Amino acid sequence: MNERTVVVRRIEEGIALDRDYVALPEDYGKDSYFQRPDIQAIRSLVFETLDILEEKTGFRRKIEESRQVVIKPNLVSVYHRSGMFEEDYPESTDPRVMDAVVEWVQKYNKKVLIAESSGKPMPTATSFRISGMDRIAGYRNTGLVTLETCPVRRYLLPKAKVMKEVLIPTPFVGVVEGKDFYISVPKLKTNLYTRVTLGFKNAMGVIPYALRERNHNYRIDEKLADMLYILRPDLTLIDGLVGGEGNTPAPVDPVDCRLLVAGTDPVATDRVGCRIMGFDPDEIPLFREVGKRGFYHGEAQVDGEVPVFHFRPADPSLLGDTFHKHFPNI
């Protein structure tokens, strides 16, 4: 067994994945949905990826022994043709992937909780409704919770640099105490603040809004490293079916990557996702910071090919290249 194994699997060309990657269609839960070629291919990909990772690491036993499994997607201003925009932006976890992950997990533990507090300004309940996460919860008989509405418990982090205290919503207290199994299912995408945003940054959506805003500045890399002292995913599955390049949390452009990345070491898994986007993790301050803290234990053993897509990086300048392209005289 090698706990730092990372599995990468892709869907072959020819199966269109650019349909319903932000929001589930109306026929979700019916035969017409589950018989679609893309849905069958995604389900097979999720099952293959997790089956191989289980064979390599044996994480299933911890799922079986846990009180429940808490699965956190990454929902960021889900606007699925909702009258605000014409386009679909690949910023949120693909609900087709989430559905397959829940189905796989329930083979080993029936008690599953989908938990999220999506980025402003979209209320999480609205994000659940638009994306279809509420229907996944209903169809699969899971719990569903908006974390911003939950009571919190205060923890002190003596080793932290900037997050000396943290408020954890009660659905994640079992994760902190080692009773529950925590799965992070982020989107493969770039980010304006941290260059990339993947599995362990997804924990930012756990803490209350006021704490997210605190040190959400040039010290954000230290803040995210601090979070690993208390919230470390037991399993990370990165949704890279349709990646997002650009200035998250602003709208991003789709990248047809057609892959999933999964691992039980959150830092090693995120480093593989970073390389897939075409970035050297050693040149990204966030990964350097977590390395200084001792959370990085060397490169993972990768099962599968690691393609490189050269995502367009986020542009943090006030007036970026796109602006100057359209307004060259300013």
Segments from the language model and where they lie:
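N-terminal and secondary-structure boundary signal
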Residues: 1-330
